[in-house]
C-alpha cells in the first residue's frame, strides 16, 4: 500500500494525520503538481482527475478522496476509532466533516484558485469572487469559534478526524 501525496494540500494532510493517529506505516509518494506529475498517463490511470491524495492498495486498487481513504483505513484498522465509536458518534463526525468541507475548505480553495499564481493560466480568475468569498470565510470562522466555545472537540467527546 502507498499514499500518493501533495504535501501542501489540506486534503492530503488530513490523510497523513489520520495515518499518523492510527499508528500506520504507509509509504508516501510525493507528487509534484507544479511540474504536471499528476497529469502523466501513469498517474491518470490511477486517478482520472489527477488529484491527491490517492491510496493505492497492494492489489493495485486505487482509492481517491480523503474522506474515502480515511473511511477505508478506519474499517481496516478500527483502533483507535477516529470516525466515531457508535452510530450517533459517526453521524456527528460525518456532519462536522461535511460542514468543514462545504463551509470552509471549498471556499478557501476558491480563494486560492481565484488569486493564486499557479492557477492564472488554468482558469479565469475572478478577484471580486475571491474578495466576497473571503468575507464569507471570515464569517464562517466566527461561527466555528462560537461552535467550539467551551468544547475540547467539535464532534463529540472524543478526538476524531
Q: Where are these predicted regions, by residue range?
A:
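GST superfamily/GST-like fold recognition
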Residues: 108-109, 154-161
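Short histidine-centered beta-strand/loop micro-motifs
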Residues: 82-85, 153-157
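GST-like domain detector, emphasizing the conserved glutathione-binding G-site
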Residues: 1-131, 135-141
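Hydrophobic alpha-helical bundle segments that form small-molecule/ligand-binding pockets
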Residues: 143-155
Amino acid at each position: 500500500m502507498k499514499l500518493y501525496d501533495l504535501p501542501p494540500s489540506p486534503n492530503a494532510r488530513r490523510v497523513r494525520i489520520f495515518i499518523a493517529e492510527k499508528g500506520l506505516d504507509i509509504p508516501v509518494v510525493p507528487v509534484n503538481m507544479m511540474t504536471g506529475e499528476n497529469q502523466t498517463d501513469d498517474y491518470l490511470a490511477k486517478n482520472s482527475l489527477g488529484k491527491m491524495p490517492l491510496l493505492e492498495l497492494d492489489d493495485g486498487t486505487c482509492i481517491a478522496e480523503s474522506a474515502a481513504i480515511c473511511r477505508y483505513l478506519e474499517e481496516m484498522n478500527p483502533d483507535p476509532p477516529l470516525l466515531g465509536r457508535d452510530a450517533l458518534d459517526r453521524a456527528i463526525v460525518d456532519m462536522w466533516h461535511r460542514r468543514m468541507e462545504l463551509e470552509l475548505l471549498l471556499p478557501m480553495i476558491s480563494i486560492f484558485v481565484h488569486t493564486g499564481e499557479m492557477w492564472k493560466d488554468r482558469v479565469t480568475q475572478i478577484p471580486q469572487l475571491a474578495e466576497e468569498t473571503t468575507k464569507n470565510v471570515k464569517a464562517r470562522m466566527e461561527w466555528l469559534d462560537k461552535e467550539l466555545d467551551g468544547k475540547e472537540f467539535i464532534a463529540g467527546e472524543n478526538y476524531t478526524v
